[in-house]
Structure formats: structure tokens, C-alpha cells
């Protein structure tokens, strides 16, 4: 009886999250706690490649994005407004609608003759799902882990967050369990290695013009960072994605990644919020505290 009652309560909670009037996330949410954390940056290759592996998203990047030519500028331009959908409080829905507007003209036909549009509900939701999973992966590996209840809370919050975009809620799974099935299915059956994905794996960070350093030295400095991100991505990919990408991962690699994650977690205990948090997240916390 108690199990059935718990299931009914969970279903009501999730259904309410999907049908209720959009309410922005606040400072007590786990999404606020993790999404603006600097450690999410370590998963740049992971999230960028997973998004680009989705055929419609990859085609849009190949045809319309400057990501591959100017990665730093493109990431900065994208991350700042997306942070706002989480941290802007009463303006979060307006920020979400603005982001939706940015994508209205991204459409076309890919090399295989398939039509794509950035505002296709399935495509738009997949991008959002990768941000949700980014939070879970960062928290699990680099911030001390999550309980099952916290994962379910983050699932409900990701639904609440998604409502800020004013998109169709049709693709959004009803429960945490259904989301896990959705994620497994897309990773197993729908993702593909395309040009946009390969270029993320081989991405280089162009030297800014104001940096007074020879380009070859700059490139050598960034090589270990990009290689490290590829290694982290390999470890956090689902096995089906890792296999499709031709990446190798051993039990020893997993042990090393877990130890590295513990070291990162320990190091960040001494990092002040002014460094640890994205500026939009820091401003939101200060605003919530009346500062």
C-alpha cells in the first residue's frame, strides 16, 4: 500500500510540474546550487558533442553556428542567456522566450536530406536534457554525489526550468524513471557521429588577439586541457555513445576519474563564490539575499 501511495504521489508531483503555471526556480533549488558552478566547464566537450550528435542539432551547428570558428565567443554568447533562464527570477520566462527567438531562423535540410528546425520540440528538448544531465554528472563526479531523492528533485526542477521557454511539453518524460528510459533510448538509437561532433572532439581554442603570445605556444598550452576534457567526456558518456565514438574506457580509467573528482571536490572547498559561480548565478544569489 505504501509503495502504491508513493508512486501516486510522485506521479501527481510530476504531472503538476508539467501542467502548472510556470514558476521560476529559486535559491533553494538544487539547480541553482549546481548549474552556475565553475566545475560544469569541465564537461564542455561532453555536452557539446552530445548535443551535436543529435542529427538535427548537429546539422544546425554545421550550417548556422560560429562555434567551430570562434568557440569561446559562441559558448559565452550561449551560456549567459541560458544561465538567465535559471537565475533571472521573475524575468526568467522573458529570458527563455528570448532564447527561443534566437533559434527561430535556424532551419534547413541536412546532408542526408532530412529537414531540421531548432524549434522542433524533440530537438529543443534534447538540448535541454543535456543541460539537466550536465548537472547530474557534475554533482555526481565532482561535487560529492547525489541521493536518489535529489536526482528526482532535480528532474522535477528541470521540468519547471523547461517551462520557462514556452515550448511544447509533449517530449518531456512524466517521471524520473521515464526520463532514464528516454535518455538511454536516444543515446542508443538516435545519436550519430557527424562532422560537428568530430570537430568538437578536435576543437582548438583560437588565441585571442589581445594575448601577446606566439600562437604555437598558445596551442601547446591548451592541448592538455582539451585532451583532459575528451577523457572526461569518454568516462561520462553512456557506453553506447562511447562505443559509437570509438573511445576506450577501462576500469582503471574509471578509478582515476573518481579519484580526480574527489580531488576537485576537495580543492573547491577553498574556492570563494566570486570565483566558483558564474556571474549571473552570483548576482542572483546576492539579489535573493537583498544585497
Predicted regions and their residues:
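Mature, function-bearing regions of proteins
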Residues: 3-291
